[in-house]
């Protein structure tokens, strides 16, 4: 959030804020600023009207996340600093454009700007929403992203991801960031930037935390645990009813077996064994169906938060 005397701007940050507040951090192992835009791709003689996720980022992105390069390599710091139009594309995009992954040195046109492909990476799962993209390019190549800012050049289009050397460094990183924020705010006349609870971890995000509000683990376990127990109660009651119905149908059989010397413990163990087998078979069938349906439904199930 950026506050001024005229109001506040709650959203992403500018390239200047990325540089002054985050690139100057010394405790994290790697820092990366990025912005995402949905744009069509084209090559000479072929235009693709479908929107692809273009990730505008820096060289730190390749340190924060581990990509498998099939050919080529990521753009360099020199490319980034000079605004050289280099691009890393995903395997599926390379095949869509040229029918092969051997496309290093070939061109791709993004928003009327021609980029040279410097690397091809294995497709990234949509579940990895921050790392996911179709094309990755230096954000210094996009003039609009670099200049379209507000609130004394504090607010813009960018987000940040950090890689800590150790989980014990989280608090130290937050304290170091507060010092950088104080220094940066001192450079401005009126505007003041504030990141609230940020940076937050992937675990924090998974339990529902956002930049303005951090969810406590105890509260999450209490709320989510209560909901899960309620949801599990329904199938548990159904299973109990099925078991009781099966026992009622076999009362005569159990009476005969008990008359021939079967103990109560033997009868109970048999019932538990039979129901466990049925439950196991049902679980395996459900797992198999999930594995079969996931490739078909992955586009709708794993939509990126950026789209």
Predicted feature descriptions by range:
Residues 166-167, 249, 275:
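Active-site acidic-Proline motif in GNAT/NAT acetyltransferases
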Residues 60-74, 85-213:
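Mid-to-C-terminal secondary-structure elements
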Residues 253-298:
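Transmembrane alpha-helical interface segments in multi-pass membrane proteins
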Residues 183-227, 249, 294-307:
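Membrane-helix entry/capping segments
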Residues 108, 237-238, 274:
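Conserved beta-strand->loop/alpha-helix structural units within folded catalytic cores of enzymes
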Residues 1-97, 101-102, 109-115, 175:
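Structured, solvent-exposed hinge/loop segments at the ends of secondary-structure elements
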Residues 1, 215-252, 280:
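Hydrophobic alpha-helical transmembrane segments of multi-pass inner-membrane transport and secretion
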């Amino acid at each position: 959030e950026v506050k001024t005397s005229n109001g506040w701007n709650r959203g992403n940050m500018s390239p200047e804020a990325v540089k002054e507040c985050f690139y100057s951090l010394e405790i994290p192992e790697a820092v990366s600023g990025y912005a995402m835009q949905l744009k069509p791709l084209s090559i000479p003689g072929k235009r693709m009207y479908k929107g692809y996720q273009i990730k505008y980022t820096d060289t730190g992105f390749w340190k924060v996340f581990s990509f498998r390069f099939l050919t080529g390599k990521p753009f360099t710091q020199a490319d980034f600093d000079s605004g050289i139009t280099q691009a890393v594309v995903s395997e599926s995009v390379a095949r869509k454009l040229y029918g092969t992954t051997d496309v290093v040195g070939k061109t791709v046109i993004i928003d009327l700007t021609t980029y040279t492909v410097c690397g091809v990476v294995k497709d990234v799962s949509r579940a990895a929403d921050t790392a996911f993209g179709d094309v990755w390019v230096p954000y210094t190549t996009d003039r609009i992203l670099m200049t379209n800012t507000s609130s004394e050049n504090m607010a813009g289009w960018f987000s940040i991801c950090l890689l800590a050397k150790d989980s014990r460094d989280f608090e130290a990183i937050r304290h170091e960031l507060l010092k950088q924020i104080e220094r940066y705010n001192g450079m401005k006349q009126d505007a003041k930037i504030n990141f609230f609870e940020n940076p937050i971890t992937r675990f924090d995000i998974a339990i529902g935390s956002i930049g303005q509000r951090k969810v406590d683990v105890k509260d999450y376990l209490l709320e989510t645990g209560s909901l899960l127990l309620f949801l599990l109660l329904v199938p548990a009651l159904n299973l109990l009813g099925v078991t009781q119905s099966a026992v009622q149908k076999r009362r005569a059989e159990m009476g005969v077996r008990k008359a021939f010397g079967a103990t109560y413990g033997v009868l109970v163990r048999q019932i538990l064994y039979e129901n466990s087998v049925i439950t196991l078979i049902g679980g395996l069938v459900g797992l198999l169906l999930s594995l079969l349906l996931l490739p078909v439904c992955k586009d709708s199930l794993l939509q990126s938060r950026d789209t």
